[in-house]
């Protein structure tokens, strides 16, 4: 069978890198990295760097390929990073790709940079259908494939983890890149300093953490603050990866992106996966940062599935979303799907046996009042988290859940009745229901909207609205898992709450547009400010993540 040869060019930010690959091997790769004299990246200077070195990088690449017996005439296509990224850098690389494609008379392939990080990881590890934790300078996302697209389950609501680390490092007087310097100082720490831990469903926020860490430098050593920052931020991203595993039922985690080179982050993810019986995969460090090979290989997959673009369609997209791409190269039958299930076939477990092993807690049955079955939710320690972080959030979430679940019920939202509260354990009414992720329909989504409207009217934000946290028992819908709930009447808090649910619809369920429309109808029927909140949801969705 004839080999396919694709030349790929990466240039979204720091690295100008070009490579030639086939289905099975890397023929050659050449990289020139932009290194500013001081501070972070300057988009215009980075673009000037790429323009200065582009011709030389490609010339050297073609020379190395020729040494391996590959001529320019053997190339089948030119792939380039079309976005997301810094506009000036993207335009420079796209221009180089167009000129090369025109001169050789071969097609262009516009590659999504984020998806390229995923595909190089799958190519270079045994991963087949993973939950992907993608953490780079500008991007922090939890992603998994479903029905023709890579779906985003959660992401940063403000700044990418890598940029957050670099921002803190600059403020602390550390040279660029900040991540490796923080990792080195963290190894010399003597104690943990409490810092903000901000998770909203499967979304994250790092800006408050960075600010608090910078302020902590006034009273604590750089080593201790670096250690505390790293332990806190990494625990947050590992937790959202675990939440995605629990929600999807998948059994693999793939780490992608430049921040993934951090040894401590890898250790924490591996510990989490071992505890859940999942497999953890991470490619070699050379494939973690931005590189031409990932663009070339993803371009090859796209080329072989007929996914090329014309010169007119080769404009760059600095805000190119992962879930905007139609993934035409994956065979649907090989991917894991959320199983269909009915209340009649839903599992019924005997007392004492674990009913569910979620990201938050293990759940099992015990005898309750009047001989009825009761459900026990025990927030067990997470080995990947620092002990102080772990005990603090388990204790806080246990208290919060008991209090706000009762408050929600008083507001007319059906929730389980709490029987007993211990430090890390709740005993509550056992609802013989099914998580609606198995059977969600537009009429059911409308009922969800009605419940959330009542919740928001009472001033409560759930904090973890997913279809795993709603149970259908007969004709009645129950809202559960209030560990991340809080009182807040702001548009932003309510908007993020609904945004988390809409992300779940889009990432997990086939008919998500109909589900969103039905939810909006139900939400408007019980919440007077629904239109304002839904407008805020659109704003949140459109916020640039590449910053």
Curated annotation (Swiss-Prot):
Kae1 as annotated region, ranges: 1-329
Database matches in InterPro entries: ATPase_NBD (IPR043129), Bud32 (IPR022495), Gcp-like_dom (IPR000905), KAE1/TsaD (IPR017861), Kae1_archaea_euk (IPR034680), Kinase-like_dom_sf (IPR011009), RIO_dom (IPR018934), tRNA_threonyl_synthase/kinase (IPR009220)
Subcellular location: Cytoplasm
Cofactor: Fe(2+)
Ranges of residues in domain Protein kinase: 340-547
Record PANTHER family: TRNA N6-ADENOSINE THREONYLCARBAMOYLTRANSFERASE (PTHR11735:SF14)
Role summary: Required for the formation of a threonylcarbamoyl group on adenosine at position 37 (t(6)A37) in tRNAs that read codons beginning with adenine. Is a component of the KEOPS complex that is probably involved in the transfer of the threonylcarbamoyl moiety of threonylcarbamoyl-AMP (TC-AMP) to the N6 group of A37. The Kae1 domain likely plays a direct catalytic role in this reaction. The Bud32 domain probably displays kinase activity that regulates Kae1 function.
Full protein name: Probable bifunctional tRNA threonylcarbamoyladenosine biosynthesis protein
Species this chain originates from: Methanosarcina mazei (strain ATCC BAA-159 / DSM 3647 / Goe1 / Go1 / JCM 11833 / OCM 88) (Methanosarcina frisia)
């Amino acid at each position: 069978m004839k080999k396919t040869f694709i030349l790929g060019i990466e240039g979204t930010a720091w690295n100008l890198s070009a490579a030639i690959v086939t289905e099975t091997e890397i023929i050659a790769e050449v990289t020139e990295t932009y290194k500013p004299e001081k501070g972070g990246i300057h988009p215009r200077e980075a673009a000037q760097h790429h323009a200065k070195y582009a011709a030389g990088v490609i010339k050297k690449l073609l020379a190395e390929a020729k040494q391996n017996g590959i001529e320019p005439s053997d190339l089948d296509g030119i792939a380039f990073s079309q976005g997301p990224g810094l506009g000036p850098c993207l335009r420079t690389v796209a221009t180089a790709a167009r000129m090369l494609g025109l001169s050789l008379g071969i097609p262009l392939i516009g590659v999504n940079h984020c998806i390229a990080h995923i595909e190089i990881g799958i190519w270079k590890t045994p991963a087949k259908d993973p939950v992907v934790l993608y953490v780079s300078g500008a991007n922090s996302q939890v992603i998994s494939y479903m029905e023709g697209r890579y779906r985003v389950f959660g992401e940063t609501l403000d700044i990418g983890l890598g940029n957050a680390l670099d921002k803190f490092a600059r403020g602390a007087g550390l040279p660029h890149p900040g991540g490796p310097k923080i990792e080195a100082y963290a190894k010399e720490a003597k104690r943990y300093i409490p810092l903000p831990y901000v998770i909203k469903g499967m979304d994250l926020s790092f800006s408050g953490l960075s600010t608090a860490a910078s302020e902590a430098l006034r009273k604590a050593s750089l080593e201790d603050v670096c250690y505390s920052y790293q332990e806190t931020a990494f625990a947050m991203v590992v937790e959202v990866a675990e939440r995605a595993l629990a929600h999807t039922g998948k059994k693999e985690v793939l780490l992608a992106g430049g921040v993934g080179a951090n040894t401590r982050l890898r250790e924490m993810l591996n510990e989490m996966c071992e505890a859940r019986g999942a497999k953890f995969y991470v490619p070699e460090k050379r494939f973690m940062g931005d590189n031409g090979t990932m663009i070339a290989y993803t371009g090859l997959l796209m080329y072989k599935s007929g996914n090329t673009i014309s010169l007119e369609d080769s404009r760059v997209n600095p805000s190119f979303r992962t879930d905007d791409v139609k993934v035409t190269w994956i065979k649907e039958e090989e991917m894991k799907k959320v199983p269909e299930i009915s209340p009649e076939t839903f599992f019924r477990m005997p007392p004492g046996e674990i009913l569910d092993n979620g990201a938050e807690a293990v759940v099992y049955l015990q005898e309750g009042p009047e001989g009825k079955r009761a459900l026990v939710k025990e927030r067990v320690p997470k080995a990947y988290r620092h002990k102080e972080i772990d005990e603090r959030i388990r204790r806080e979430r246990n208290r919060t859940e008991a209090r706000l679940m009762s408050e929600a019920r008083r507001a007319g939202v059906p929730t389980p009745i709490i029987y007993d509260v211990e430090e890390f354990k709740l005993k509550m009414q056992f609802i013989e229901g099914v998580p609606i992720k198995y059977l969600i329909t537009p009429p059911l989504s409308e009922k969800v909207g009605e419940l959330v409207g009542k919740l928001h009217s009472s001033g409560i934000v759930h904090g973890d609205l997913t279809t795993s946290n709603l149970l259908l028992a007969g004709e009645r819908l129950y809202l559960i898992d209030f560990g991340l709930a809080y009182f807040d009447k702001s548009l932003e808090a309510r908007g993020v709450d609904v945004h988390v649910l809409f992300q779940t619809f889009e990432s997990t369920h086939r008919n998500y547009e109909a589900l969103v429309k039905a939810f909006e109808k139900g939400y408007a029927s019980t919440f007077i400010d629904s239109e304002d909140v839904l407008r805020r949801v659109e704003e949140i969705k459109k916020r640039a993540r590449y910053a």
